[in-house]
Every structure is written in C-alpha cells, then in structure tokens.
Amino acid sequence: MKEETFTGMLRDAFGSNRAEVILEALKEEASTAIRLNPLKAETEPEIVKGTFGNVPWCRLGRVLSERPSFTLDPAFHSGVYYVQDSSSMFVGQVFREMLGKPEGVLKVLDLCAAPGGKTTDMASSLREHCGNGFLLVSNEVMSNRCGILADNVARWGDPNVIVTSADPSAFAKLPGFFDIILTDVPCSGEGMFRKDEEAVRQWSGENVELCCARQKRILADVWPALKDGGLLVYSTCTFNTKENDGNVEWASETLGAEIATPDCGFPGVLRTGCGYSLAPGLVPGEGQYCAVLRKIGGNAAGQRGSRTSRPEKSGKPDGAEKLLKSLFTFDPVVSDRNGTMIASPAEIAAEIAVITRTVRTISSGVKCGCLKNGKLVPDEDLILNAFLRENAFEEVETDRQTALSYLHRDGIVLDAGIPRGYVALTWRGVRYGVVNNLGNRCNNLHPMNRRILRSI
C-alpha cells in the first residue's frame, strides 16, 4: 500500500485533523459489538455482562469490552444475537428513518448480503414496523458465501426473509418490484484495515478505481428493479470520496435519482455532501459510509407495495398442511421441496413465488423437515424459527456442556424421565437444536455443515 496516497485520500474525505485521528486509531485493536435479536433475547445474554456500552444509533447494539469466544457460546448458535461492527449498525438506523407507513406488502432487497448483518438488522426493523406484511430478499452473488448467509438467516428465525444467489442484473427481470434496495457494495475496504490485513496489502489507487467502476455497474444493473419513488440505500466500508459521495452523485446524475439521505446525525458521525461517514477514532467501530437515493417518479417507498398474482398451490403430501398449520403462530402455505416440507407465511406467499420463479433461491420459508410414515422428522431450522408455537415439541433445558456437545455433533444422553421422540433442546430458555430421544441415547440432528469444529 502506498501510504502517502492513502493518507491523501483520507484527508480529502475527512479533513487533515480528523485524518490524523483516524490514522492513529488504525494502529489500535478493532472493537467488538453484537446486536440482540428482539425475537429471542428476552433478557440480556450472559455475554453482554461487562460491556463497554450501548451503540448510540441502535437500541439493540452492545459494544463489548473484549472479544469472547462466540463459537463456544450456545446463545450465538441459537440466534440470540448477531456479531456485527457497531458502525455497520448505522446503516440500520438510516433504514429505520426511511420507513413510512406501509400499505400492502413492503418488499426489500439486500443485494450484497453475506454474511447477513444488515439483513438481520433490517429484518428486526421490518418486523417491528410492518408486522407480517413484509418480504426481505437477502441476496449473495458469491455461491461460496451463500451457506453462511442462509445459516445466519435461519438462526435469526424470521420466516419473512428468503435467501437468493443471483447477479444484480438478474433482478432487472423484476421491474419496479422492490420498494427499498440496500446495496452494501464490495469496496476497497479501507474501513476494515484494523480487521483485515489482506485489505491493507491489496489497497492501491488503481484498486479504488476498479472498485468504483464495479460499484457503478452494480447500481445500474439493479436500478430497474426499484419502483418509481423507491429508495436505494448505498453503503460501503471504505473512506475515499470516489467510492462514496462520488458514486452517489454519479447515480443521481446518470440513473435518474435524487439524494434523499435522512437526517440522523450522531456525535462522531461525519455528514458528507451526500451521506454519512464513520471512522475509527471518531466512533468506537470501524469504517462505514451510507447514503440514500430516491428513484425519480411515483410514490415514496413504503407507501404502497406493488400487487402480485396469487401463487399456484404447490404439491404436498396428505395431512402435511394440517400438521404444519398447528406448529406456527403464522398462517403457513405448505410446499414440498424435494421431499422437505417448507412453510411460508401466507401473507407473502405470492411475493415469494415471484422471486423463486425469477432468481436462484437458496432458501425460502421455514425448512420444517420431512414426513416419514405420516410423522414429521423435524429440521433444525424449524426448531430455530422464532414463530414455532411454544411447546410444539417437548422441550428440555440443558446445561452449557450439553449444548456444546450437541453443537459439536457429539452423542448426548437425556435424563431418564424425558419422553422418547423428538425433543427440542434449550439453553437459557431459547431453542438451539433437536434430537430424537431413544432413551439410552439420542440421535443428534444438528446439520454437519453447522457443527463446531474446534475442541470444546
């Protein structure tokens, strides 16, 4: 990395005095923060004890005094919280400021979503703001990153979030479909220098130009999918003005948009010409930029969801719909996907059908399990879902070591008084897994791809 080139860009973006503060902060250790899941975190999890403080722009955000081993915390695996940089949570605050009164299903696309921090943040805001009346499409074009995204969405437990894997251009087949689009675009990563040594090594002025061009292509490709009057949130984790304000100005002039960044300033957050910029030394977290564009024409996003046709009924085994309807607190539409029962909220089934017909879908609805001899063999995703009815399965509270043994995919044995059959396991009152209790032993149903690999 050419330090003088980087320093010059930093001064252009923040001014000389702030740039010096940021340069000193980049020599320090990165902070660690988590965001609580309001669907599951009824009380503060144990890991929050001794926190440095709350995140000013996120009531569910907590800055930790040190970085613990999240892998060895059952609450992490059950979706009680998500590990996310506090600066990244600022995008969620901007998103919340944009939400108007919805009429119909509010349709939102997180275009570059992996590993899922902003998706889960928006899901919490949409659930609070819209109830059941929203669809959040969480997309990741890189197939090798889709698995962790789908796992994190499953842990979060909201059935109104679906995961897709498509190039931004694929969404042009859905003209005007989305009310809001978040583009957390790939960037030069200057804001991640404290966490990513590879980003430091790869940084150059030439790479900034390449990133800038790629970001413009992404914006242009997805733009047709945004409805007239819809809102696009543009964000990066970098500092330089070319990838930030420069691209927002380009989009405004080229794509037909107006800059519509809401007023949501906080101490330490720099208001730029088009948006907001955060940097270490000025705030506890890492680097983040965020701005909002409104597509010229039509009504404002969040005011009216576009109409979609009803989906065709999917084939399903006899009795499956009745069985699954009894399991959820929402009204499910049941389908059979290669032998696995999927339950999707009826309120957004039409919108889900449009997406699944158009782009490659990794997961949609709740993966419930399969039927064997008329009985459901539950999938772990069903147990993790926050809208599974209480006591839908026998539940057993376990100690920490039993939870870790399950997550390590070791054999476990439950107390003799526990009924045989499928049992949901809980840690501090939150479900994290499921076993088939055979009496003298249990069949561990934790997916192999999610198991803890390190020694416990």
Predicted features along the sequence, with ranges:
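S-adenosyl-L-methionine
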Residues: 141-176, 183
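Helix-to-beta-strand junctions that scaffold the AdoMet/dcAdoMet cofactor pocket
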Residues: 131, 226-228
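Polybasic, low-complexity RNA-engagement segments
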Residues: 1-41, 45-46, 286-289, 296-456
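Conserved SAM-binding loop of SAM-dependent methyltransferases across substrates and taxa
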Residues: 115-131
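Class I SAM-dependent transferase core
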Residues: 58-97, 443-447
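Conserved class I S-adenosyl-L-methionine
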Residues: 103-114
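Conserved SAM-binding motif I beta-strand of class I
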Residues: 135-140
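Mobile active-site "lid"/loop adjacent to the S-adenosyl-L-methionine
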Residues: 144, 179-221, 233, 237-245, ...
